[in-house]
Amino acid sequence: MYKRNERLNLIRKRVDQYGQVAVKDLAIFLQVTPETVRKDLETLENDKLITRTHGGAIQYNHINKEKSYANKWQKQSQVKERIAKKAALQIKSGEIIVIDGGTTTGRIPQYLNDITQTTIVTNSLKIADELNRAIEEQRIQAEVIMLAGKTNTEQDVVRGHMTNELLQRFKFDKAFISCGSFDTSDCYEFDLEEAHASHIMIQKSQLSYLLADSSKRDAHASYRIDGFSEIDYMISDYAKPQNIEYFNQKHWLQI
C-alpha cells in the first residue's frame, strides 16, 4: 500500500509519461479506491501540477492556458464580426443547427434575420441568451435548445459526458465550430472536453463550418477537434495557403 505522498508522485510521473491518465486505471495501479484517486487528483490540481478531466487527468500547462471568454471576445473583434456575419448567411429556415461556444460563433445570433421554423442547439450560455433576444425582437422564429452539462464559467459553456451524450441524439443540418488554433491539416481547442463536444457536432452534421480568424494559425491549443478532411467549409480572413489541401477554393470562404 502506497503512502499518500508516494501516490501523488506516482500519479505525476504517469501523467508526465502518458500525457493523460484515467481514474479507474490509477485505482488499479495504486491499489486504492477511485474516490481516493479523485482526492489525490484534486490535491495535485490545486497545486497546479495536473489538470483534472472527466474521468481522469492531463498535464498542466500554464503556457497554453486559455484566456477567459471576456478577454478573447475583445481580440480580433472586427474580423470576428465579419466572419460571424458570413456564417449567419449560411443558416436557412427550417434547418437544425448546432453552434459551439466560441467568441466568433458567439457573434452569429446578432446577424440572424428572417429565418423561421429553425432549431438551434448550443452548449454556449451566451449564444442561448442572444438567440432568445433575437426571438423576443422578432428577428427570427426558432426553437433554442440549451444542452445540459457541467459549466465552464470562464468560457460560458457547458461540457462533459452529459453534453456529449445529448449531442449524440441529434442529426444536424449544419454545425458552426470555432477553434483555439489550426495548422495545415487539423484544428485544435484548449480544453479537451470542449474539443470532444465540437468533434461530435461535426460528426453529427451534414455540413460543418469552421470559423477561425488568422490569429489562430499555428497558435498553441493542444487538443485536436478534427482534421480538415472532416470539415466542409472554412470561414476566415486568412487566405487559403497552398499547403492546406483539404479545402478547394469554393469551400474556403475568405471574408
UniProtKB/Swiss-Prot annotation:
Keyword annotations for this protein, in alphabetical order, are:
DNA-binding, Transcription, Transcription regulation
Q: Which InterPro entries match?
A: Carb_Metab_HTH_regulators, DeoR-like_C, DeoR_HTH, NagB/RpiA_transferase-like, Tscrpt_reg_HTH_DeoR_CS, WH_DNA-bd_sf
Q: Which GO terms describe its molecular function?
A: DNA binding; DNA-binding transcription factor activity
Point out the coiled-coil segments of this chain: none
The UniProt record lists the keyword Ion transport:
no
Q: Which PROSITE patterns match?
A: HTH_DEOR_1, HTH_DEOR_2
Locate the DNA-binding region by residue range.
21-40
SUPFAM superfamilies per UniProt: NagB/RpiA/CoA transferase-like (SSF100950), Winged helix' DNA-binding domain (SSF46785)
Kindly indicate where the leader peptide sits in this chain: none
Domain HTH deoR-type intervals: 4-59
Q: Does the keyword Transmembrane apply?
A: no
Source domain of life is Bacteria
Q: Known Pfam families for this protein?
A: DeoRC (PF00455), HTH_DeoR (PF08220)
Q: Which PANTHER family match?
A: AGA OPERON TRANSCRIPTIONAL REPRESSOR-RELATED, HTH-TYPE TRANSCRIPTIONAL REGULATOR SRLR-RELATED
> What's the protein called, per UniProt?
Uncharacterized HTH-type transcriptional regulator SE_1102
